[in-house]
UniProtKB/Swiss-Prot annotation:
It comes from Oryza sativa subsp. japonica. Residues 32-483 form the Hexokinase domain. The gene is HXK2. This is Hexokinase-2. The keyword Zinc does not apply. One of its GO terms (cellular component) is mitochondrion.
Length: 494
């Protein structure tokens, strides 16, 4: 009897051991598959120094091609007609209007010249009623002009408009426009939920000016710009060595100061300054040297603009979290990363926003508590292991650092085009103004951009290159450009 019982116990123990071994083998295979996905991702995203130099070289080549002729490059290299950036000498009251989405901002600033600088500024933000986004052109611009008129009416005693002068406005219009002068441009098409057919092909400055006249508001639009050029203007106002601006936020773009005689497609008279600001629209850059993965290709194919904005889809805040989601989905499907069932929410495109990715990536707690909390909040995944959380952080690290490497390579391309990527004997500073939430708030990303650029340039050159955070280009930058292109500028210079 005892022998039988002992045999039964031994058999049960053997079964238990076998089950445990099988479970451990299954677990090992699962982690092996997840690790294989991670290793392949790391390999495909790799951007060693040689490859980054090829990307920078390709950017410089495309810049040359885009300046030579319209349509000659994936980079539009748009002539902005901004031939003068703020010098710091500007004085007076100037306004800005920033229209780029469902809200718009109005801003006024009192400038006091070299000594006073920005004496005071005020702003207001107004929501656009949804029906005006798809109504008539007059209705939309009348609403904007009416809001601007109310804002002007609240102008206090701290703001001093010189006697006999017209108020002047910088207009940041973040929609596709064919610029025809510093203060005119025709709308190519609406985006971001706007759909007003009668405005397409019309000069948006003329539309705004007519609406201002209907409100009885005596105000002249002296500059039509986008947010990137505004960032360049704001950066130059603060630091005379700023030569380029880069937006690294939800989207991405770059603008820089070019010599007008180095723009073959410019057929007008050379500006007095000899300079011209170029809006690169660099998000549309592409090159065979860009490290693409299956996840990037699928994201691009399923996007609203397949084959377009490839660079932007690799480096901007709109897409980084989505790339991470796609990698984690593959791990969940092929390696049961989050258990036997794939979390339903993980199948929802763009559910992992880049700010969430940043929080997980920057988690420094020993048990990666923030990662666990975010996986629970966003995906509904309960009780993840530390090993799983580490894997998620690794995915974020690979995706974010590839983006930072490529952003740095793009900046290097601009420096190369301008001949600022080689040592100069007088140690002249070169400053790049950067704006955007991705750069401002995602610390690991920003630090990686800076360290990668330093490594690419080498010690001698990098000691003269500065990347500087420049906030609110679309607001203060527009007002500063209104001042720099004031109709009274030449009279003041006499």
């Amino acid at each position: 009897m005892r022998k039988a019982a002992a045999a039964a116990v031994a058999a049960a123990a053997a079964v238990g051991v076998a089950l445990l071994v099988r479970r451990q083998l299954r677990e090992a295979k699962r982690w092996g598959r997840a690790d294989a996905v991670l290793r392949e991702l790391e390999e495909r995203c790799a951007a060693p120094p040689g490859r980054l130099r090829q990307v920078a070289d390709a950017m410089a080549v495309e810049m040359h091609a885009g300046l030579a002729s319209e349509g000659g490059s994936k980079l539009k290299m748009i002539i902005s007609y901004v031939d003068a950036l703020p010098s710091g000498e500007e004085k007076g009251v100037f306004y800005a209007l920033d229209l780029g989405g469902t809200n718009f901002r109005v801003l006024r600033v009192q400038l006091g010249g070299k000594e006073g600088r920005v004496i005071k500024q005020e702003h207001d933000e107004i929501s656009i009623p949804p029906h005006l986004m798809t109504g008539g052109s007059n209705e939309l611009f009348d609403f904007i002009a009416s809001s601007l008129a109310k804002f002007v009416a609240s102008e206090g005693e701290d703001f001093h408009l010189a006697e006999g002068r017209q108020r002047e406005l910088g207009f940041t219009f973040s929609f596709p426009v064919k610029q025809t002068s510093i203060a005119s441009g025709t709308l190519i098409n609406w985006t971001k939920g706007f759909s007003i057919d009668e405005t397409v092909g019309e000069d948006v400055v003329t539309e705004l000016t007519k609406a201002l006249e209907r409100q009885g508001l005596d105000m002249k639009v002296t500059a039509l710009i986008n947010d990137t050029i505004g960032t360049l203007a704001g950066g130059r106002y603060d630091d005379n060595d700023v030569i380029a601006a880069v937006i690294l936020g939800t989207g991405t773009n770059a603008a820089y100061v070019e010599r007008a005689n180095a723009i073959p497609k410019w057929h007008d008279l050379l500006p007095k300054s000899g300079d011209m600001v170029i809006n690169m629209e660099w998000g549309n850059f592409r090159s065979s040297h860009l490290p693409l993965t299956e996840f990037d290709q699928a994201l691009d194919a399923e996007s609203l603009n397949p084959g377009e904005q490839v660079y932007e889809k690799l480096i901007s805040g709109m897409y980084l979290g989505e790339i991470v989601r796609r990698v984690l989905l593959k791990m969940a499907e092929e390696a049961s990363l989050f258990g036997d069932e794939v979390p339903p929410k993980l199948k929802i495109p763009f559910i992992i926003r880049t700010p969430y990715m940043s929080m997980m990536h920057c988690d420094r707690s020993p048990d990666l508590r923030t990662v666990g909390a975010k996986l629970k909040d966003i995906l509904g995944v309960q009780n993840t292991s530390l090993k799983t959380r580490r894997l998620v952080v690794d995915v974020c690290d690979i995706v974010a650092k590839r983006a930072a490497h490529l952003a740095a390579a793009g900046i290097h391309g601009i420096l190369k085009k301008l001949g600022r990527d080689v040592p100069n004997t007088d140690k002249q500073r070169t400053v790049i103004a950067v704006d955007g939430g991705l750069y401002e708030h995602y610390t690991i990303f920003a630090e990686c951009v800076e360290s990668t650029l330093r490594d690419m340039l080498g010690e001698d050159v990098s000691s003269t290159i500065v990347i500087k955070l420049a906030k609110d280009g679309s607001g203060i930058g527009a007002a500063l450009l209104a001042a720099a292109h004031s109709q009274y500028r030449e009279a003041e210079e006499l």
